[in-house]
Design a protein with these regions (language model features):
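Conserved glycine-rich Rossmann-like NAD(P)H-binding loop of the short-chain dehydrogenase/reductase
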Residues: 30-45
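Substrate-binding pocket helix/loop in short-chain dehydrogenase/reductase
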Residues: 98-99, 103-111, 193, 204
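Residue(s) in the substrate-gating loop at a strand-loop-helix junction
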Residues: 142
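C-terminal substrate-recognition "lid" of short-chain dehydrogenase/reductases
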Residues: 122, 130, 134, 212-241, ...
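Alpha-helical segment proximal to the catalytic Tyr-Lys
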Residues: 127, 171-175, 232
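Conserved glycine-rich cofactor-binding loop
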Residues: 14-15
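Active-site helix of classical SDR
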Residues: 122, 158, 166
């Protein structure tokens, strides 16, 4: 795959893991399209980081839970405009709570962004990549989708759903030379984990053999590998980036 002529689309890319993924893919030669619903200032910072390393990037505001907005975005900015080589479904939110107290809207909203939004992007990317007869789709799942996590019934369900979607889509698209894989991060230093108390962090570390939280760059490098030619014979897999936490 000639990366200098190829575009990688990363959702939820203005900060955290998504921003690190965009940075790595730009480093590897892709033109990167970043989407998110975060503030414009965060978009500007993400673009600046990429351009300062000599990369090419554009930022777009996109709520992936709005299926029509996703379809419109692909029609306006992707289809017949660029060679879409990579899609990274990273957009995600949390609305934690114990199951007996969880509100319907909190369950539905997390699935709308984390699972249905990923599906909407995957579907549009698959149409384009199938015609190209090449492409890489990488879904960001989570250790919570593999092992479950108390207080995250909605989040865990969505991330487990991403794994099932990954494996099914991989079987459907393999004949078109499109690979579909997932990356399942463990506990990573991001805005989502920054709010954890020291007591909670210490409890998590007890279950991580490497005795540290991961960095966004650890996940980004795994994504960059799956997006590369080195991973051309890998599809339908879940790459765990979790410091040794095993299901």
């Amino acid at each position: 795959m000639e990366t200098s002529a190829a575009t990688a689309l990363v959702t939820g890319a203005f900060r955290g893991i998504g921003r690190a993924v965009a940075h790595c893919l730009a480093r590897d030669g892709f033109q990167v399209y970043l989407t998110d619903v975060s503030e414009p200032e965060e978009a500007a910072l993400a673009i600046r980081d990429i351009e300062e390393q000599g990369g090419r990037a554009r930022a777009f505001r996109l709520d992936v839970s709005d299926v029509q907005a996703v379809n419109d975005f692909f029609a306006a900015e992707i289809k017949n405009k660029v060679q879409l080589a990579v899609l990274v479904n990273n957009a995600g939110i949390t609305r934690d709570g114990f199951v007996i107290r969880m509100q319907d809207e909190d369950f539905d909203r997390v699935l709308a962004v984390n699972l249905r939004g990923a599906f909407a992007c995957l579907r549009e990317a698959a149409k384009i990549m199938s015609k190209q007869r090449c492409g890489r789709i990488i879904n960001i799942s989570s250790v919570s989708g593999q092992m479950g996590n108390a207080g995250q019934v909605n989040y865990s369900a969505a991330k487990a759903g991403l794994i099932g979607m990954t494996k099914s889509a991989a079987k459907e698209l393999a004949g078109r030379n499109v690979t579909v894989n997932a990356v399942a991060p463990g506990f990573i230093e991001t805005g989502m984990t920054a709010v954890l108390s020291e007591e909670v962090r210490a409890a998590y570390l007890e279950h991580i053999p490497l005795k540290r939280l991961g960095q966004a760059g650890d996940v980004a490098e795994a994504v960059a590998f799956l997006a590369s030619d080195r991973a051309s014979y890998i599809t339908g897999q879940v790459l765990a980036v979790n410091g040794g936490m095993y299901c």
